[in-house]
Structures are given as C-alpha cells and as structure tokens.
Amino acid sequence: MEQGSILIVGVGGIGCKWSGGAHDKCQQLAELLMIDADESSFTSEHEAHCLHLDASGSARGAAALPNLAAHRLNEGIANISSLLETSELVILLTALGGGTGSGATAEIAAKSRDSGSLVISIVGIPFAEQPLRCAIAEKALPPIERNSDLCIRVSLERLAWQARHRNSDWKLGSEWIGELIEGLVTTLGRVGKINLDLMDLRTVVGRPGNATLIVGNGTTDDPDGVVKMARNSPLSEISVDGAKGCLIQVEGGPDMTLGHLNRVSEAFVSTLDNDCQVILGARASEDMAGRLRLVAVVSGL
C-alpha cells in the first residue's frame, strides 16, 4: 500500500494516547489523526492532523455527552474529509464510556466507509465498577460495530491487569495496543517474503460472524510462546477456536527459518475450524533479529 493510504485515528482522550503511541511505531507507513474536545490531547511530540471539537476555545469538553460530541464532529467534519477520502484503511482507537469517543467514533467510521475505506475499530470497554460509563458504552457500541468492517473490543480490566505485569500504563495501551497496530500496519504496508494486502484482509473480515485481531511477540528460541501470548491478548472474553477465516502473518529477522514459520502458523491454526480459509504471509527484517511476531485476523467466530 502507498504511504498515506493507512490512517490511524484516535478519538477522545484515551484514543489519542493509544493512537499516538501506536503511530510512533510505524510513522513511515501511516498518517495520524487525533480528535478530541480537550486540546491538551494534541501534544507536540506527535506529528498529527488534529480536529478540536471545541473550536470556540471555551474548554467546554464533552464528558458523558456523546450526542454533543457527535454534533460538534458534524460541524467540523469538512476539515478532515479529504484525509478520510484518501485512506484505504482507517484504524479507529477509542475508549467508550465518556462523551467524545462514545459520540464521535461511529460517525467517523460511517464517513470512512462511505469513502470506500476498510474500517477497523478498536474500542476500550469500561471497568465493571463504572455503571454510568458502562451504560454509555453499551449504547455507543452497536453503531460503531455496524459502521466498522472489524470491531475489536478491548477489556480495560484485562488491559490494566497486563499493564501491571509489564510495569506499564494501561492508559497508554500497556504497550499491547501499539504492538497490535504496528503488527497490522507493517503486515499491510511493507513488502514481505509472502505478501498480504488489503484484498486479503477484506476477504477474511467479510465472513459472517464476529472477528478479531490479535498479536503475539517472542523469540526464535520459543515459537510456542509467541502463539501462547497471542491467545492471551487482553481482549474481552473471546475464543478463536473454530474460526472459519484467518489471515496470519509471521514476522522475524534474517535468522527466521521455514521451521519457525511452520511451527508458529501450524500451532495457531490447529484449533481453528477444519475447513478454515487460511491466508498466510511472512516477512523478514533486520530489526526483528532474534525475535518472532505473529499477527492474525480471525473471523467467522
């Protein structure tokens, strides 16, 4: 894919943090757009297109008011229309339960699909002990799912649990969000030994049923650990067992062998449906020396 045809979009405060961290890992392969009612989300450390949903400068915010955020987005959508229209793949990142992410994400997804883009939404689901945020998220999720080709739910509770084990900040995605996006973008944006492209992705996510995107990282000494990590991704409770479609990319360094590729891919697909359509890709790069990464989109769940 050509540079600029992949767009990473952060919506709301958490979404902007996630998108900034993710874009840092693949700046040469994707554009970055940040959308929020709080201007402090737009930090100078990231090269990003920004849409401020409080153009009056009154610092009104949109906390717990999704309809207000949607209204303000529609007022400013013309400012980002050309960016959406030139993107083949739009990756939306947000956390539901507040105003901006809950109100604006579905609108961005719909506008992107109307422009012909493939839309992947990654949405954070609130902690169970936040009943108001959970109620807002429950109402916001269906239109996001309807307007996305693939909608991935991320449990903030599981993300926070993993962050503690990694000594990282869940609000920054506990590193997992960045790894997930980097894996997907490099899978589609760089030439590999066995190439995957957007049509392969469309084929997989077009299957009936639910779909999800997962990533696992490890070393060439422990390919089984890569698969185990992928299966323990901090999503909502979801099993890939019996999946009907799978796009899988295995990445490694110059030391990655055909044995590594077979070990990782065969271990991952072993629990999928016997008739699962599997599309396999592989890529080697100097910066992955000694390491392996598995990126998989599974569908028909």
Where are these regions (language model features)?
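Tubulin/FtsZ superfamily GTPase core signature
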Residues: M1-L301
